[in-house]
Amino acid sequence: MVLPLMICYRPIGIIHSPFKEPKDVPIQASAAKDIEGTVEVFPEFSEGLKDIEEFSHIILIYHFHRAKFKGLLVEPYMHEEKHGVFATRAPARPNPIGISVVRLVERKGNILRIRDVDILDGTPLLDIKPYVPEFDVRENVRIGWLEKNVHKLEKARDDGRFFSLNFNYIFPASLLEAPERAKL
């Protein structure tokens, strides 16, 4: 079987948050209690939001558009030893895809108001899925090297180690310069 060299995804929207730079972004949504943001779904995808407001939480799948891949061994947040990138949640990955479970506060048309946001402003949104505990929660899990470090999560913030200062957005900058469009 021959695999394609490239797989292309088209953003379905933009995530807006108070975090304009990677530094100081909470490193997980569970450490971003009550931080508000919005999801602006592009109009051509807004029909797909039908009934989303019936869910209290949603899963956002997005592209780490400013992450800079540095290799398969990384020194993750909350630990000073290198680990394989696939044993971490570091944003700099071969395929820089992020996921966050956030609270859905309100939907107005193609705009979703959310809380517990740990995402950089202007992040391209790839997909949205409803969070369903019966599907998504697992029991008797092992968390590897994080077992000794998970207590650091609440205060852990991005220090910029995985991000590049030079980047190109994959859609028009004018969309990113109009955050007032995303306000409810």
UniProtKB/Swiss-Prot annotation:
Instruction: Identify the residues that the record assigns to the TsaA-like domain, covering every copy.
Output: 9-140
A Pfam family this protein belongs to? TrmO_N
Q: Specify the domain of life of the species encoding this protein.
A: Archaea
Respond yes or no to whether keyword Repeat is given for this record: no
Keyword list, A-Z: S-adenosyl-L-methionine
Keyword set includes Repeat: no
**InterPro entries listed in its UniProt record:** TrmO-like_N, UPF0066_cons_site, YaeB-like, YaeB-like_sf, YaeB_N_sf
Q: Which residues bind S-adenosyl-L-methionine?
A: 26-28, 65-66, 89, 120-123
**What PANTHER family does its record include?**
TRNA (ADENINE(37)-N6)-METHYLTRANSFERASE
**Stored NCBIfam families:** tRNA_TsaA
Family, as annotated:
Belongs to the tRNA methyltransferase O family.
Q: What is this protein called?
A: Probable S-adenosyl-L-methionine-binding protein PYRAB06630
Q: Which source organism does the UniProt entry give?
A: Pyrococcus abyssi (strain GE5 / Orsay)
